[in-house]
Amino acid sequence: QISYEIDKSIFFITYFFAPLAYVHFFLYLCSELQVMAVESNCIMEFSAQQIAMLLGGKVTGDADRKVSDIGSIENAKEGQLTFLCDAKYINHLPTTNASVVLMTESIDFEGETNATIIRVENARAAMGQLLSLVAKAINPAKQGVEQPSFVSEGVVIPEDAYIGAFAYIGKNVQLGKGVQIYPHTYIGDNVKIGDNTILYSGVKIYYNCAVGKDCILHAGAVIGADGFGFEPDANKVNQKLPQIGNVIIEDDVEIGANTTIARAMMGSTIVRKNAKLDNLVQIGHNVEVGESDFLCAQVGIAGSTKVGAHSIFAGQVGVAGHIELPDNCVFGAQSGVSGNIRKPGMYQGSPAIDAMNWRRSVIGFKNLPDIMSKLQNIEKKLQ
């Protein structure tokens, strides 16, 4: 493994006084050299002041304090960076061994701590920015076509794209700049893949489907398999209804491992931009998932349902077909959504109802044996 020796004094001057745009470029260059990789032999240190400049934060404490790694606030060690975004964890701040703590500026703390604090508007989001840099260093973008792989004649492969071994690229496929197609991936005929999209190993994209820019599809995701469409004939034999539509995944969508999105019977199954789907999610044919929706593991949405934007579906939520849900809804774990929802809000239970009413109902159900016993006693007295 090649190690890169960096003159720390030159780096400090360059980084500390450079404009923010140049800082981003320099960090990108560092990631390309893989000097930031956690498992590398060459570990780069950053001061609290440098991190604050990058994130637009304000330093309290020793601005020259150095960090070269990341840890949780409970278990962090000297030389590590951590973050605090929720006041309920404030009790860890006086005792943490972390050298630097990113803290949401709205959290009130007047106590003492050995850590240097960087106050930012949103510590979780700021930590995300830093983790993005580390992630690019740990798993940098690749280029080139590995063999054996199959690319259909006439498919144009951008110079900065990567196609892993045993990948299959069908006819008339359009690949955007910087796409990353990992080994054992299947891309059917007439598929479009947008710029900088990542398809991890084992992703399957059926014919005529489209994936936008800056998307991430994790291992085993299946896009465009036939929707579950059948019709019994006069003899009650299930006859298949051909699914001739497609799937459209818009920009900045992330799809978890082993999630399946069925192709439309006619038209398109659509996942709107910035939606995030967890592992093991099932999306039926002709469904529309709204912009910036969160779908947690084992959510299932039946065919032709339209989901509004900015909604959250907790684990194992089931949604019936041919219904409409508005924007800004939250459905608690294991809820069963059996009909149209008219207004935004929090819903729970099966069938899903207003979450507050559901909590009252649960309390009533829990007390039902006692209530029945009291009613029986009253009945006996009246006889």
Where are these regions (language model features)?
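Terminal amphipathic alpha-helical/low-complexity segments used for targeting or macromolecular assembly
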Residues: 2-4, 8-12, 24-148, 160, ...
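Serine/threonine-rich, low-complexity intrinsically disordered segments
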Residues: 4, 8, 12-18, 187, ...
